[in-house]
UniProtKB/Swiss-Prot annotation:
It catalyses: [protein]-L-glutamate 5-O-methyl ester + H2O = L-glutamyl-[protein] + methanol + H(+); L-glutaminyl-[protein] + H2O = L-glutamyl-[protein] + NH4(+). It is an enzyme of class 3 (hydrolase). Residues 8-125 form the Response regulatory domain. Its main location: cytoplasm. PROSITE patterns: CHEB (PS50122), RESPONSE_REGULATORY (PS50110). It comes from Xanthomonas euvesicatoria pv. vesicatoria (strain 85-10) (Xanthomonas campestris pv. vesicatoria). Residues 165-352 form the CheB-type methylesterase domain. Its EC number is 3.1.1.61, 3.5.1.44. Contains a C-terminal catalytic domain, and an N-terminal region which modulates catalytic activity. GO terms for molecular function: phosphorelay response regulator activity; protein-glutamate methylesterase activity; protein-glutamine glutaminase activity. The modification 4-aspartylphosphate is found at D59. It comes from the Bacteria. This is Protein-glutamate methylesterase/protein-glutamine glutaminase 1. GO terms for cellular component: cytoplasm. The gene is cheB1.
Amino acid sequence: MTLETPVRVLIVDDSAVVRQMLTEILSRDAGIEVVGSAADPLLAREKIKRLNPDVITLDVEMPRMDGLVFLENLMRLRPTPVVMISSLTERGADTTLQALSLGAVDFVSKPKIDVARGLEGYAEEIVSKVKMAAKAKVSALNRPSAPKVTLDMQSAPVAGSALRFRTTDRLIAIGASAGGTEALRVVLEHMPADAPAVVMTQHLPASFSTAFAERLNRHSAMSVREATDGEAILPGHAYLPPGGQHLRIIRDGARWRCRIDDGPPVNRHKPAVDVLFRSVAANAGPNAVGAILTGMGDDGARGLLEMLQAGAPTLVQDEASSVVWGMPGAAYKLGAAQEVVPLDRVAERLLALSAQAR
């Protein structure tokens, strides 16, 4: 039996206390070796050259050089998986989402107070995300932009008919996790304003959901918003669960409505993709289309299978374009995905499959 080489980690944080805590947390795992730490990006730059780490943990707010500037330079000159350590504030959410757009693989939220003691509560998450990052494909984040698609595009004909349909009868459900903030942006960026309604679940801390919805809305012709309980689901609109709550759909006569669910975590997540997908399977059946994008773990796989069994067309993002092929891979292995699609074709295929949904 061969032992796996430990993941080599460099910790970059201006707080000596945080550097010490992260070192202790990561060093407890036999699969991780902390090869060094740095108090600012300029020191980190030299240590990266010398130590060649597999993963870097990076504080967002740093002295001497802005963390985002450092990250952008790193991804351009020496692409390395990065896990951001960010604060649970509105400003922290915006900065972290920007970091993810620049190429960071994932992030861990830093407690607002008593950081040293608070980080211990995130120990399991920190370790799992660092290990996941070591396997992530950073190059998948630097992809060419897909052409914008429209409902009457003929590049992917379905049964010889144009991609036109009554959008009030169709619903698209999407789930994502690690790498998903950018993957969802790419998909929504290439959806036309008159696309079918989209309901989405992305694993995020509660305090990040508003900033994420606003960010997606700036990049899409669709109207992207946090869902409110009981609101009608309309064509041309995309809905995310509000912070730290599940999103489900319910049937109300000839339309669907959002149901905000404050129930317990599912698959250790809240919001959970499975909660959304199972409600879509039960209430929309063959009138829906399901998709799982990049993400760690297996949340959504069983729900996507239920959607397929209910008559909905399904797809997952392919491994080559995924930052982490955990959730899509789990769904594929379960037999829940009818198609495996590169990210730059997901929007096109969702529209095509919606056109043929019964």
